[in-house]
């Protein structure tokens, strides 16, 4: 199948100058780039005009094409290996500058850092100011971050000529890759700084003050902008992310903005009712226990939970459990026996309805087994 004429593909005359070729390529690249044109033929046309530009923008390849046509490249495959196609790289970046608002950056933003900050429940509830200590990478003071020995400076990479990228040409297609020699920096250091060993960065301990807002919870994250590692070649520093972990409390458990606690009561208070003291974040308060309270009964105390900034406060939920008395003396034991006897003399079913239900269920269970 015969290939299209490269001049025809770009829509230019055979005597077109270098600027005409570049302008034609930019115009067609914007029109047929797959990211902008979803037509099924756009990708094919984009590859064709890219191939045409690679040949016509290179004086030697253009001369060979003008003399021999497409056969000039059938044997050599247009060469191979890494090379710095500066014309193609520049115009390609120009096109993407129009697409995305700027040239691609070779500089690399600093790495983000993470730190786990442990808080007590009281600190998380009320808010706190905490200091954290980390070790991070900062610019080397001896070389001012250049990585080069004092009195010297980095030199332009001879492989990519400072572009930071090379192009592997396979037939009519060009693969863009990071320069293997300078690793995308576009510069090389001949005499590295002894302090940072050419890295331009050194480790240094840092102390930061962190304002913890009231009501924060475990797994919440605070971001300190620009407090991460320094960037490459003047790029911005990364951020420091402070992950919050709230320690377990010896009284309260937390769920969002609500607090939960278990409170023991004696069986007399459970049976007859009364008042007990329960803890809150603001101090102890009185809680009224109604008569005939059972273990597991939960009492809600409004607005005594977590009080986050500018949000509705949570509630406190107190679950009571009846504590069985221990280490009884003989008098106490006799009183309990007398009480138990009084239950027998009256209707125990009336005093202990749950026991009655259980015994009836157990009898029914065994009856079913024997039938």
Swiss-Prot record:
InterPro entries: DnaJ (IPR012724), DnaJ_C (IPR002939), DnaJ_domain (IPR001623), DnaJ_domain_CS (IPR018253), HSP40/DnaJ_pept-bd (IPR008971), HSP_DnaJ_Cys-rich_dom (IPR001305), HSP_DnaJ_Cys-rich_dom_sf (IPR036410), J_dom_sf (IPR036869). One of its GO terms (cellular component) is cytoplasm. Residues 5-69 form the J domain. A zinc finger (CR-type) spans 127-205. It is found in: Cytoplasm. CXXCXGXG motif repeats lie at residues 140-147, 157-164, 179-186, 193-200. One of its GO terms (biological process) is response to heat. SMART domains: DnaJ. Its cofactor is Zn(2+). The J domain is necessary and sufficient to stimulate DnaK ATPase activity. Zinc center 1 plays an important role in the autonomous, DnaK-independent chaperone activity of DnaJ. Zinc center 2 is essential for interaction with DnaK and for DnaJ activity. Participates actively in the response to hyperosmotic and heat shock by preventing the aggregation of stress-denatured proteins and by disaggregating proteins, also in an autonomous, DnaK-independent fashion. Unfolded proteins bind initially to DnaJ; upon interaction with the DnaJ-bound protein, DnaK hydrolyzes its bound ATP, resulting in the formation of a stable complex. GrpE releases ADP from DnaK; ATP binding to DnaK triggers the release of the substrate protein, thus completing the reaction cycle. This is Chaperone protein DnaJ. It comes from Hamiltonella defensa subsp. Acyrthosiphon pisum (strain 5AT). The gene is dnaJ.
């Amino acid at each position: 199948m015969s290939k299209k004429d490269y001049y025809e593909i770009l829509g230019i005359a055979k005597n077109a100058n270098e600027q005409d070729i570049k302008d034609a390529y930019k115009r067609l690249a914007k029109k047929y780039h797959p990211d902008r044109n979803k037509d099924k033929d756009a990708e094919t046309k984009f590859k064709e005009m890219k191939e045409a530009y690679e040949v016509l923008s290179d004086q030697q390849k253009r001369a060979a094409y003008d003399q021999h046509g497409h056969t000039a490249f059938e044997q050599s495959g247009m060469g191979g290996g890494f090379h710095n196609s500066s014309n193609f790289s520049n115009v390609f970046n120009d096109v993407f500058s129009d697409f995305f608002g700027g040239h691609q950056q070779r500089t690399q933003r600093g790495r983000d850092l993470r730190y786990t900050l442990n808080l007590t429940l009281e600190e998380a509830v009320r808010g706190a100011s905490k200091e954290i200590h980390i070790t991070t990478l900062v610019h080397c003071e001896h070389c001012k971050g250049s990585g080069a020995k004092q009195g010297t400076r980095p030199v332009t990479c001879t492989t990519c000529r400072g572009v930071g990228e090379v192009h592997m040409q396979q037939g009519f297609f060009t693969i863009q890759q990071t320069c293997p020699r300078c690793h995308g920096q576009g510069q090389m250091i001949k005499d590295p700084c002894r302090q940072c060993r050419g890295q331009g960065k050194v480790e240094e301990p840092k102390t930061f003050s962190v304002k913890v807002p009231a009501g924060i919870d475990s797994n919440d994250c605070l971001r300190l902008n620009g407090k991460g590692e320094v960037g490459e070649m003047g790029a911005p520093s990364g951020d420091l992310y402070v992950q919050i972990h709230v320690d377990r409390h010896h009284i309260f458990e937390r769920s969002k903005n609500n607090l939960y606690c278990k409170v023991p009561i004696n069986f007399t208070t459970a049976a007859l009712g009364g008042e007990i003291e329960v803890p809150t974040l603001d101090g102890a308060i009185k809680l009224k226990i109604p008569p005939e309270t059972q273990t597991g009964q939960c009492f809600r105390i409004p607005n005594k939970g977590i009080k986050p900034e500018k949000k509705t406060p949570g509630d406190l939920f107190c679950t009571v459990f009846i504590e069985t008395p221990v280490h009884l003396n003989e008098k106490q034991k006799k009183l309990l026996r007398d009480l138990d006897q009084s239950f027998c003399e009256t209707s125990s079913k009336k005093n202990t309805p749950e026991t009655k239900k259980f015994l009836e269920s157990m009898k029914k269970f065994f009856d079913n087994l024997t039938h």
